[in-house]
UniProtKB/Swiss-Prot annotation:
Its EC number is 1.1.1.103. One of its GO terms (cellular component) is cytoplasm. The keyword Secreted does not apply. This is L-threonine 3-dehydrogenase. It is found in: Cytoplasm. Its cofactor is Zn(2+). InterPro entries: ADH-like_C, ADH-like_N, ADH_Zn_CS, GroES-like_sf, L-Threonine_3-DHase, NAD(P)-bd_dom_sf, PKS_ER, Zn_alcohol_dh. It comes from Anaeromyxobacter sp. (strain K).
Length: 345
């Protein structure tokens, strides 16, 4: 089959046409991929950064954001039938650790990542356990279904705390950050402020519904807070940037008793003024992936109740033009990039 493969321990990803079709175990489902999306993780793997070198075995079929149709099911699978439109949870969990057995699979100690530690979805076919397959309702378009993985990250992070009537700060205007901003507005936050230094992505945040999108290299965040009538600080902070300076500023402008969810990963150790956390009585929560499968149910419910994410998909290419997709992702001048397998030449 055709697939995008991390074939060498160097910068790049390569199209190969002779990749073996994955085998289907008795509890597995084979999905014929129709559309894929490029994740920031895929860009890290493309760049072959320090994390990728330590994490990804080579060769590896990459990718974990997709939508497709069931092609084949294993002998013991009863919940799915060929032809059904589906996506899949990208974290394969063990099922036996304490957290898995308690229903907290997103906290599994032995998580294996699709397209990172096991063959992924930048391929004509991907095989995952039936437990990881999620059926997509007919009223959700393919382009949105293909980004359920990062949409799930945004949902898990944003809905970590009650947002109704709250003032929310989102640090980082990448695709997940701007989707989190849209979610916060959808569920009833008062002011949603997004910070970044990338004007393209700040404009995207505005189109996704942010009250204010602030370039902190040019504007004073506290002045913006005053303009909005905020007197005591933000009630909820969502750290999506992985930038130490952004996190430190977030802590400075949080209200006493505020709540902070962190999805962004810092590149290395960062100095933090922990007195901000202690004396303000802040709550911090780390977020990894999606709650299985409460996050998925909430994603569908929000889309079916009017949440509009269409603006976050900014570029579309045929899978044969994947290099253009990676180039625009690496430029920082994009939202989500979707690759169409049906448009292959």
């Amino acid at each position: 089959m055709k697939a995008l493969v991390k074939a060498k321990r160097e910068e790049g990803i390569w199209m190969q046409h002779d990749v073996p079709v994955p085998e289907v175990g008795v509890h597995d489902v084979m999905i014929k991929v129709t559309k894929s999306a490029i994740c920031g993780t895929d860009v890290h793997i493309y760049n072959w950064d320090e994390w990728s070198q330590k994490t990804v075995p080579v060769p590896m079929v990459v990718g974990h954001e997709y939508v497709g149709r069931v092609e084949k099911v294993g002998a013991e699978v009863e919940a799915f039938r060929p032809g059904e439109r589906v996506s899949g949870e990208g974290h394969v969990t063990c099922g036996f650790c304490r957290n898995c057995r308690a229903g907290r699979r997103h906290l599994c100690r032995h998580t294996v990542g699709v397209g990172v530690n096991r063959p992924g979805s930048f391929a004509e076919y991907v095989v995952i356990p039936a437990d990881n397959v999620y059926r997509i309702p007919d009223d959700i378009p393919d382009d949105i279904a293909a980004i359920f993985d990062p949409f799930g990250n945004a949902t898990h992070t944003a809905l970590s705390f009650d947002l109704v009537g709250e003032d929310v700060l989102v640090t980082g205007a990448g695709p997940i950050g701007v989707m989190a901003a849209a979610i916060a507005r959808h569920v009833g936050a008062r002011h949603v402020v997004v910070t970044d230094v990338n004007d393209y992505r700040l404009d995207l945040a505005r189109r996704m519904g942010a009250s204010r999108a602030v370039n902190v290299a040019k504007e004073d965040l506290r002045a913006v807070m005053s303009e909005l009538g905020m007197r005591e600080g933000f009630d909820v902070g969502l750290e999506m940037s992985g930038n130490g300076r952004a996190f430190r500023q977030l802590l400075e402008v949080m209200n006493h008793g505020g709540k902070v969810a962190l999805l962004g990963i810092m590149a290395g150790p960062e100095p933090v003024d922990w007195s901000q956390v202690v004396f303000k009585g802040l709550q911090l929560k780390g977020v990894y992936g999606r709650e299985m499968y409460e996050t998925w149910y909430k994603m569908v419910a929000m889309l079916q109740s009017g949440l509009d994410l269409s603006a976050v998909v900014t570029h579309r290419f045929s899978i044969d033009d994947f290099q253009q997709g990676f180039d625009v992702m690496r430029s920082g001048r994009s939202g989500k990039v979707v690759l169409d397998w049906g448009a292959a030449r």
